[in-house]
Amino acid sequence: SSWGQTDYVDIPEDPERKAELERMGYKSLDERLAERFHTTVEVLKMLNPGGKPAGMNGSSTSGSGGADTEKTNSSSSNSTSKTADFFTAGQQIRVPNIGNDRIAKGKVEDRDWQHTLASLGIGTDQPEVDKIVVSKAGKTLKAYQGDKLVALFTVSSGSSQFPLPIGEWDIVGEAYNPPYSYDPEVLSGGKEDGETFKLPPGPNSPVGVVWIDLSKEHYGIHGTPDPETIGRAQSSGCVRLTNWDAARLAGMVSQSTQVIFEA
């Protein structure tokens, strides 16, 4: 089957129904393409006006439909979905050249994580970093080898209700494609624990594709189901990146990496 033909999922709003899903996978081919090329669906549409690559002469070929094209995956677990994709399997499109997506043979033991890296266009050749510094004011995460800055990511971090825990922390471990225990009462500021829902893993999980666990209990660095909110919306105390940046960062850090949170 082609790269674009896979099962897509309708993600319900209700956490109880989310917990019934096997996986919180991609909702559409459009969303999957945008994550693969580290951008938004809107940018991909701008690069492919009318459903064909910008600057290409002539009309689009068969199978390269535009905005009114319906989903091509008849085997999807959600054949009743009314969402129409702009892009279709087999369509020739223009995309950002993100590079560095080679996964070295034998480098990743977890096959599910290897599949995630491939779907996000993240290669295994990443720098090993000694220190990361998160700036709440700057909405940035800077990664260093010694004194050399080797990576800079935009992040969302903390809120007045759940402030970023300023200070130095250790990395305890990493969880790839983790399930997520979700308690709406706690996240809405309630003092009492409410009903907890165990949400399945996937790119549309509240913590995205990876959780980098910190020595501060309940706090971590993780991905997101809503990449367009990074750098804009606040988070529940944790540090949130796009899924592709979180996956890159996971390949850079280890338990010996120093973590500093600044105001």
Model-assigned labels for residue ranges:
Residues 1-46:
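Primarily a LysM-type cell-wall glycan-binding module
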Residues 1-5, 43-112:
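Extracellular LysM carbohydrate-binding repeats and other cell-envelope/extracellular binding modules
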Residues 16-34, 80-82, 127-131, 198-202, ...:
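Second-shell loop/turn segments in exported
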Residues 30, 46-49, 65-82, 115-130, ...:
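N-terminal post-signal-peptidase region of extra-cytosolic proteins
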Residues 30-31, 41, 45, 90, ...:
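Extracytoplasmic/secreted envelope proteins and their assembly/folding machinery
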Residues 35-53, 98, 146, 247, ...:
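Sec-exported extracytoplasmic/periplasmic mature domains
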Residues 53, 185-263:
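Exported/periplasmic cell-wall-interacting domains
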Residues 82-85, 91, 96-168, 172-174, ...:
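Cell wall/extracellular polymer interaction/catalysis modules
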